[in-house]
Amino acid sequence: MRLGIYGGTFDPIHIGHLRMAVEVQEKFSLDKVVLIPCNTPPHKENGAAASARDRLAMVRMAVEGRAGLEASDMEISQGGPSYTVATLEALQSPDKELFFILGLDAFLEIHTWKEYERLFSLAHFIVLARPWQGDRAEMFHVEQYIRENLPGLAVPEPDQGYFRALHENKRIYFAQTTALDISATHIRKTVNQGKSIAFLAPESVEKYIKRQGLYL
């Protein structure tokens, strides 16, 4: 099984998250993309605005009825800070090929993550390129970053359009998805101002936010 792993705070989940997941699933022929809300984000000083329970509920609502997308509570049920290395380790299985999905900005800080060297032996990476730049431009940017911060972990394969990790034959791919200028921060501010978030988040999520009084 080709399994996409998409972690995040999802505070709240929105149409941008979902559209990206669908496009990555199709582009890389993934059997499934699992969206995993973190319990406590280790790289965010103020934590999440909504509780883990609420964020998980919203992710479950957002993917309900959508073939190929699934919500998981594995990081929330584990408790404590959510570390990607532990998540990918727990998902290892002979019948699974893991693809870890993350944005370029997150990738360019990966040398600050816990046991970051091990990540490249646990899963392929799918790095989401910025919408205003092409894959080739991003590859050049990432090549510089790897050379300076991750020496010995990956080498470029420019003719193939990816980097090859030097452990377990994993690869670092690049993908561009439809540019949707939507952010969870903007949604929280919009809710706080008493304005509508219709068509920014799934209707079920919008109703849940109102019902629970989130982000006020």
UniProtKB/Swiss-Prot annotation:
Catalytic activity, as annotated: nicotinate beta-D-ribonucleotide + ATP + H(+) = deamido-NAD(+) + diphosphate
GO biological process, alphabetically ordered:
NAD biosynthetic process
Q: Which Gene3D superfamilies match?
A: HUPs
The pathway that the record names for this protein is: Cofactor biosynthesis; NAD(+) biosynthesis; deamido-NAD(+) from nicotinate D-ribonucleotide: step 1/1
User: What are this entry's molecular-function GO terms?
Assistant: ATP binding; nicotinate-nucleotide adenylyltransferase activity
Q: Provide the alphabetized UniProt keywords.
A: ATP-binding, NAD, Nucleotide-binding, Nucleotidyltransferase, Pyridine nucleotide biosynthesis, Transferase
From which domain of life does this come? Bacteria
What Enzyme Commission number(s) does the record list for this chain? 2.7.7.18
Q: What class of enzyme is it?
A: transferase
InterPro entries registered for this protein in UniProt: Cyt_trans-like, NadD/NMNAT, Rossmann-like_a/b/a_fold
Q: Which family does it belong to?
A: Belongs to the NadD family.
- Kindly give the PANTHER family that the UniProt entry links to this protein: NICOTINATE-NUCLEOTIDE ADENYLYLTRANSFERASE-RELATED, PHOSPHOPANTETHEINE ADENYLYLTRANSFERASE
Function, in words: Catalyzes the reversible adenylation of nicotinate mononucleotide (NaMN) to nicotinic acid adenine dinucleotide (NaAD).
| Protein name, per record | Probable nicotinate-nucleotide adenylyltransferase
- What is the protein's species of origin? Desulfatibacillum aliphaticivorans
